[in-house]
A protein has these predicted regions:
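PP2C/PPM-type serine/threonine phosphatase catalytic core
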Residues: 1-53, 59-432
Length: 432
């Protein structure tokens, strides 16, 4: 929904993706017991159960970057999984020293591309490659599979951002007549084309088979986009929305778009992402070593070079100080009917509503589709003329039919939401 803005710079995507399964393997006894359910499900070309993909992208400065992510990010994931020879968590792992070396070489090459092309923050980037073999925790039962999807997501995000950033750096700024007057072009390394996906031609002419146009348009795009994606994998072909099916969710996130779960037992919102803002302790620690440009705007919000987000795709002028697309990755195992739904929202929704208010609005809707519309509409109405683009995706999970059971349903935030609507409709309140 466009809201009070002249253009809608938000985009979204949903569908299936061709990568191996990463779900937690079921015990043999349960697998046999659920054999009848499995026969009714769907499998991917590899024989694994299908992996589902959902994403929300909030563009700023234009929609070029968010449209690129909508159309291409899932293909970067598929290509990365293929390059990494990602193994299914449902099959026995294959050990190969040559394969391990190949993965490390791919990762090291990508990091070096960032160091050579952008420099700054990335010259201090550690490690040179991503950890894909070390367990993420002491209780990790399947370290290879877990770390494989982790490394695949990290590589895909940084590779997509490298292609987008390099493509913009090779173009002219419309207001500048030639490359000699362009600080980005004149400061470009001689081997810049070596890191492009089509090095034989300029990045501005690096057409994709999907977009059928140069990445980011014909002139340099200096804006960017946040990204929050969720991948859902099941151990059997039984779909994740079946009440009897367990599932695993992996989220990868940059910026201030958000992903929430609603727990059936108590009706509480469970955030799977954190906002990447300068005021966030982790982000402040990460960036203060490289940037002394934190400022506070008139609303008391900290910004870095005018940006509210410390992680994003694009934003080429801020890459050197660490505004990167390194994703925050989280893995969540779901028992059957443990959660009722998943929500992906842009900051046009979260600017007006708290996490619990968001899930309570969804509880009152009859279908996930109507819930998405009601979320965007409510957020836009409450924000009034100051409303931002608002986008919401609601995904039905196994506990959908029980979404109002725990925590008293949606009554906990009902008064607050009604008060916000009254305030929004009061003309005197809008003038304050």
């Amino acid at each position: 929904m466009r809201g009070g803005r002249p253009h809608n710079e938000d985009t979204h995507q949903a569908g299936t993706i061709e990568i191996p399964a990463f779900a937690k393997r079921q015990p043999v006894s349960l697998t046999r017991a659920n054999k009848q359910l499995q026969e009714n499900g769907a499998a991917s070309e590899s024989g694994d159960p299908q992996v589902f993909y959902f994403g929300v992208f909030d563009g700023h400065g234009g929609a070029q970057c968010s449209e690129f992510l909508r159309d291409r990010l899932h293909t970067y994931l598929e290509e990365s999984a293929s390059k990494f020879h990602m193994e299914s968590s449902l099959q026995d792992p294959k050990e190969s020293d040559d394969g391990h070396k190949q993965l490390l070489d791919l990762q090291r090459t990508l990091v070096n591309s960032w160091k050579d092309t952008v420099g700054g923050y990335f010259r201090r980037f550690r490690p040179e490659y991503f950890s894909i073999f070390k367990p993420t925790s002491s209780t990790d039962e399947q370290p290879t599979a877990v770390n494989s999807i982790h490394a695949t997501l990290m590589y895909a995000f940084l590779h997509a951002d490298m292609d987008f950033t390099a493509a913009q750096a090779s173009k002219h700024t419309p207001s500048l007549p030639s490359s000699t007057d362009d600080p980005v072009l004149s400061d470009r390394p001689l081997n810049d084309n070596d890191v492009l996906s089509s090095p034989a031609r300029p990045a501005s002419q690096n057409f994709s088979n999907v977009l059928k146009r140069p990445i980011g348009g014909h002139t340099r795009f200096q804006g960017g986009s946040t990204a929050s994606i969720a991948l859902i994998s099941t151990p059997t072909p039984t779909p994740f929305w079946n009440p009897a099916s367990p599932a695993t969710i992996v989220t990868a996130h940059c910026g201030d778009t958000r992903i929430l779960l609603c727990r059936v037992s108590d009706g509480k919102a469970v955030p799977l992402t954190t906002n990447h803002h300068p005021s966030t302790p982790v982000e402040a620690t990460r960036l203060r070593r490289f940037a002394a440009t934190f400022v506070t705007d008139s609303f008391g919000e900290e910004r870095i070079l005018g940006l509210a987000n410390t992680r994003s795709f694009g934003d080429i002028s801020s890459k050197r100080i660490g505004v990167s697309a390194e994703p925050e990755i989280r893995l969540t195992h779901m028992d059957p009917s443990e959660y009722s739904f998943l929500v992906l929202i842009s900051d046009g929704v979260t600017a007006s509503l708290e996490d619990q208010e968001i899930v309570d609005i969804v509880k009152e809707a009859k279908t996930p589709e109507s819930a998405s519309k009601e979320l965007a509409t409510f957020a836009t109405e409450v924000a009034g003329i100051r409303s931002d683009n608002a986008t919401a995706i609601v995904v039905r999970l196994g506990g959908w039919e029980r979404r109002v059971e725990g925590g008293g349903g949606s009554i906990g935030t009902k008064e607050v939401r009604e008060w916000k609507k009254v305030q929004a409709e009061d003309p005197r309140a809008s003038r304050q």
